[in-house]
């Protein structure tokens, strides 16, 4: 599974050099390609193709007829999904349409999150980390107590 955060830069042609650690996981456990899609104006998601197929099936099974918010989210992920393959230098070309929709440009953080990768603008990632570290630990403990999660 994917883990860790890597500060990277998108080059002038829109290419991202994916760390060897992530490429190795993909080639050992999956195929050497990813599906990239837009989750929000703050980040792109990258899934191994096999994991994306599971997510896409779940998205297609969502009951969205009476829920415009869920329908828009479903459409956002499904309509923007594209398969990317590495070049010989281990880079992927991020589609121009997706780059245009996110509010980051060159300085990014590629984060491993279990079965996927997340591409954040560096400023947004830092703000997210500051917020997470500033959250009230008692409130977090209470919220975690309402779940089945055991750390």
UniProtKB/Swiss-Prot annotation:
InterPro entries: MraZ, MraZ_C, MraZ_dom, MraZ_N, MraZ_sf, SpoVT-AbrB_dom, SpoVT-AbrB_sf. Residues 5-51, 81-124 form the SpoVT-AbrB domain. The keyword Transmembrane helix does not apply. SUPFAM superfamilies: AbrB/MazE/MraZ-like. GO terms for cellular component: cytoplasm; nucleoid. Transmembrane segments: none annotated. The keyword Amino-acid biosynthesis does not apply. Gene3D superfamilies: Transcriptional regulator MraZ domain. Keywords: Cytoplasm, DNA-binding, Repeat, Transcription, Transcription regulation. It is found in: Cytoplasm, Nucleoid. One of its GO terms (biological process) is negative regulation of DNA-templated transcription initiation. GO terms for molecular function: DNA-binding transcription factor activity; transcription cis-regulatory region binding. Forms oligomers. HAMAP family: MraZ (MF_01008). PANTHER family: TRANSCRIPTIONAL REGULATOR MRAZ. NCBIfam families: division/cell wall cluster transcriptional repressor MraZ. Belongs to the MraZ family. This is Transcriptional regulator MraZ. It comes from Neisseria meningitidis serogroup C / serotype 2a (strain ATCC 700532 / DSM 15464 / FAM18). The gene is mraZ.
């Amino acid at each position: 599974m994917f883990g860790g955060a890597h500060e990277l830069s998108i080059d002038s042609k829109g290419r991202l050099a994916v760390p060897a650690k992530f490429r190795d996981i993909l080639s050992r456990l999956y195929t050497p390609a990813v599906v990239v899609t837009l989750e929000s104006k703050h980040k792109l998601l990258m899934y191994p193709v096999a994991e994306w197929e599971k997510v896409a099936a779940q998205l297609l099974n969502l009951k969205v007829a009476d829920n415009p918010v869920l329908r828009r989210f479903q459409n956002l992920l499904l309509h923007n999904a594209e398969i990317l393959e590495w070049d010989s230098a281990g880079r992927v070309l991020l589609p121009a349409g997706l780059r245009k929709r996110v509010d980051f440009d060159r300085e990014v953080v590629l984060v491993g999150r279990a079965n996927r990768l997340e591409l954040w603008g560096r400023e947004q990632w830092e703000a997210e980390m500051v917020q997470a570290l500033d959250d009230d630990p008692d409130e977090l403990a209470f919220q975690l107590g309402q779940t089945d999660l055991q750390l």
